A protein has these predicted regions:
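Short inter-helical turns and helix N-cap capping residues of alpha-solenoid HEAT/ARM repeat scaffolds
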Residues: 46-47, 76-77, 109-110, 140-141
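N-terminal alpha-helical scaffold/docking segments in eukaryotic complex subunits
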Residues: 1-64, 179-195
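Conserved hydrophobic register position within alpha-solenoid helical repeats
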Residues: 53-54, 84, 117, 148
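Eukaryotic acidic, Ser/Thr-rich intrinsically disordered low-complexity regions
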Residues: 145-195
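Amphipathic alpha-helical scaffolding segments comprising HEAT/armadillo-like alpha-solenoid repeats
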Residues: 26-41, 60-74, 93-107, 126-138, ...
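Residue-level detector of extended alpha-helical repeat arrays and alpha-solenoid scaffolds
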Residues: 50-51, 81, 114, 145
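Core register positions within helices of long alpha-helical scaffolds
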Residues: 57, 87, 120, 151-154, ...
Length: 195
């Protein structure tokens, strides 16, 4: 953690989470919550097969998000944190927990986790993410800088596809996260049912 605290962009990040960052809440019964927390402890490994098996035991869809947000700061393996942030992307527009996980990911020590976290914030299209993204525009590594640039561009123009195609391919790239994101998809008006 010492290296991270010395980075200038980490120091410039806001120290408090937005007011909407209430403690994660879950509708699951107490015994089920305990089981999910134990599964997430096993999830914290570099072994992809073990993570995949643990992932199958988590509740599908939105009910898992409060637990991912709760476990994220204590998760040691970069691979596990990347998986957590990746899964939250699908719910960035409909879940406060997914958005908050994106904000937490922006402070991560791994550039790959920060890249995925910028993707959550870009897909959410929420302007209150901009104060968390702007310091990353001056990050030392190119991956974080480009991800933050794409996310800021996507939010400013309210077009999540600009996150991936914010340079030479502007207007030619579509980032399809859920059904309805692709203008050429026949069922473009319906959202995917991930719950």
């Amino acid at each position: 953690m010492g290296w991270l605290r010395r980075q200038w962009w980490y120091v410039t990040l806001p120290r408090t989470q937005p007011a909407a960052a209430d403690p994660p809440a879950s509708e699951l019964p107490e015994d089920e919550q305990l089981r999910v927390r134990n599964v997430l402890r096993r999830f914290d490994t570099a072994d992809a097969a073990v993570r995949e098996e643990a992932w199958k035991e988590l509740p599908p869809g939105r009910p898992a998000l409060p637990f991912l947000r709760e476990a994220f700061p204590e998760t040691k393996r970069m691979e596990a944190r990347i998986s957590m942030v990746y899964e939250a992307t699908f719910f960035a527009r409909v879940s406060e927990d997914a958005f908050q996980l994106g904000l937490l990911g922006c402070r991560d020590r791994s550039k790959h986790v920060r890249d995925r976290a910028c993707g959550i914030l870009a897909y959410s299209l929420r302007k209150d993410a901009l104060p968390f993204l702007r310091p990353l525009l001056r990050a030392d590594d190119e991956v974080t800088r480009e991800a933050a640039e794409g996310a800021v561009d996507a939010i400013k123009h309210q077009n999540h596809s600009l996150y991936w195609g914010h340079d030479a391919l502007r207007g030619q790239t579509f980032w399809v996260v859920n059904r309805g994101d692709d203008p050429w998809f026949p069922d473009a008006g319906r959202d995917i049912d991930r719950e």
